[in-house]
Design a protein with these regions (language model features):
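Active-site loop segments of alpha/beta catalytic cores
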Residues: 3-167
């Protein structure tokens, strides 16, 4: 039940101090949610166990996740979120099939969110080519890892960036 999240957004928007401020809603990206579902633990060591043993299951789960994530986006926007961030903690684990597991699922969410009139921030953590990601997925803004050179990236994309600093 995610209704406490939506109620919090409503309450924040009603707050006198925040009534004219943007509120960033948050969703996990399909790939990251899939990693947690199948791996059952955080892949902190960079390993995903038995992940591609059933491609049909993975594809079905991605479709289901797309539907549920869009509902979560819609409910956050309806409650008053003015920006949505798609956080993909484990996108750096994708070694091939970027279209299938990273670009297309994220693009679906970005297009849906933009159709609601809301800008989208993406953070595909750990990927090697932020320029390519931005060209395909077209987020309103992108968060970058601390090891990405922001000046270099800005030569290749035309959207705001955030991050690029070592924690």
């Amino acid at each position: 039940n995610l209704s406490p999240i939506y109620q919090l957004i409503v309450d924040l928007k009603k707050s006198e101090d925040l009534e004219n401020k943007d509120i960033i809603g948050f969703v996990g990206a399909p790939w990251t949610l899939l990693v947690y579902m199948i791996n059952k633990v955080s892949p902190k060591n960079g390993l995903i166990k038995n992940f591609f043993s059933d491609i049909s299951l993975i594809n079905n789960l991605l479709k289901i996740l797309d539907k549920f994530i869009k509902t979560h986006i819609k409910n956050q926007v309806k409650a008053g979120a003015t920006i949505i961030q798609i956080f993909d903690s484990w996108s750096g684990l994708i070694k091939s099939d970027f279209d299938k597991y990273l670009y297309n699922p994220t693009l679906s969410l970005v297009n849906y969110t933009k159709s609601l009139g809301v800008p989208v921030i993406c953070f595909p953590r750990g990927i090697t080519d932020y320029s390519q990601f931005c060209k395909i997925v077209e987020p309103s803004m992108v968060n970058i890892d601390y090891d990405v050179d922001p000046k270099n990236l800005l030569k290749n994309i035309d959207i705001p960036i955030q991050g690029g600093l070592h924690p």
